[in-house]
Amino acid sequence: MDFLQRILGILSSEDVAPALFASSISVLFLILSYQVLYPPSKYSAFPTINGTRWLALSNRRILAEFVTDAQGLMRNGLEKYDIFRIISSIGPMTILHPKYTDEIHNDRQLNFMAVLAKEMFPNYPGFDLFREGTDGSTVLQDAVKFGSSRCLGKSTQLLSDETSTLLQKLWGDEPEWHEVTAKSSVHDIIAHLSALLFYGPELCSHKEWLEVTDEYASVGFLAARQLRLWPPILRPIAQWFLPACRRLRYLASRTRGLIEPVIAARQKEKAICYSHGRQPPVYDDAIEWTERAAKGRPYDAAMSPLLFSINALHTTTDLLTQVILDLSTQPDLIVALRQEILSVKPQQNGWKNASLNQLLLMDSAIKESQRLKPTESILMRRYAMDDLTLADGNKIPKGTVLGIPIFGMRDPKIYVDPDMYDGYRFQKMRDKPGFENKCQLVSTSPWHLGFGHGIHACPGRFLAAVQVKIILCYIVAKYDFKLAGGAPPKVQSVGIELISDTEARLAVRRRQEMVIGLE
């Protein structure tokens, strides 16, 4: 069954509905009370384009329309208004025209983690993975910044050493055409490389750990999607019955059971070393980075390190998959990328950051894929911690969830033929005055929000760029690849999520030409 159909099917699932029916009846009066206690408020200053009340979420038609056509709703809204409200799966959201991007991007009254708390239910059992940081703590953000800088120093060599072996295993050495599933193979590569970067020697090769944490992340996102389909007042009940939530609680327990003994053993080892006047060994992994970043502050030592690999696994997998699918229809661009790789001529001991920075065309092609297909259709989502007045006098009330739609990334005033893929686009734009440093993959701007923009821009984007470039170098240099036929790849839109095609197949074959530094 199609992924989107499965999501919508939750609304009428035979597995869930009977168990919830009795409980739903028992709280029906609460819904009526809620409408009395929480009438339309100051939020109604902006028009709502797909409903008039938050409790309209109980209307399946409104919710289904948002899940299947959020972009269409926003496009219609922007044709009429600069600011409007939309009933989303996390409640009412205020959508700002992209022209407001620069005005809000560094505003510290606007908080991202508070939005994450609304989207990912961190206080429900099993959703422990998404809890860190939603309480106002900055341990996670500090750990990501510290860990990313550590990874950049060691990642190029490590990734270079491993990528060739992984591709040989997953794509083979056959000179004849054969088929692979693009996203699943990319997922396996990113999962393995992330484990090497983020987990210590005890866990990076632990089969059960890798399987459980991978499933935990996938089920966590699925469970959150399912819960968002229920009216807010029913979610505390629904989470006990939904199959994905039940599975998530088991996976959370199993994850803790695997990582907590490792943490305990390290703490014991440190205590013994200190008692004998010795310095304990230093582990260069996410467990250690988070502990050092915390500086004595409380945090979830078992779950916080997982967020390094979870973010890398899902967002980087999606980006690299989309890049490969886009390139598979651009044979001339693939040839040009091979020539660029050869011109850089990495040393025999692998790629370095300096050589990766010379791959201007590759950088441009990746950024172009991200421009046309970011991970979400509403970016820079923020929660207003206080009342906010915009420069034009519009007032954003405290408690508003707001966001910027992606349409600015197809602005014809910035981009020529904005709906067309042009792998050379950002390489050429570097020559324009004022754009020299704004067209790199890791650069953020009001007209490219792929990694966000401002104080909440993705702190892991520098490491993600290194990962994608190294893997892509090996794929482009060592393999011919093209779409395997059938229907062209389609982006799946589920609410605000934009998901690269999970089923797209590639025809691949090993090239025989030797590439300097890649053999």
From Swiss-Prot:
Primary location group: membrane
Phenotypic consequence of gene deletion: Blocks the ergot alkaloid pathway at festuclavine, and downstream products are eliminated.
Molecular-function annotations in GO: heme binding; iron ion binding; monooxygenase activity; oxidoreductase activity, acting on paired donors, with incorporation or reduction of molecular oxygen
Pfam family, one: p450
Places the protein is found: Membrane
Source taxon at top rank: Eukaryota
Topology relative to the membrane: Single-pass membrane protein
Associated pathway: Alkaloid biosynthesis; ergot alkaloid biosynthesis
Listed name of the protein: Cytochrome P450 monooxygenase easM
Lineage: Eukaryota, Fungi, Dikarya, Ascomycota, Pezizomycotina
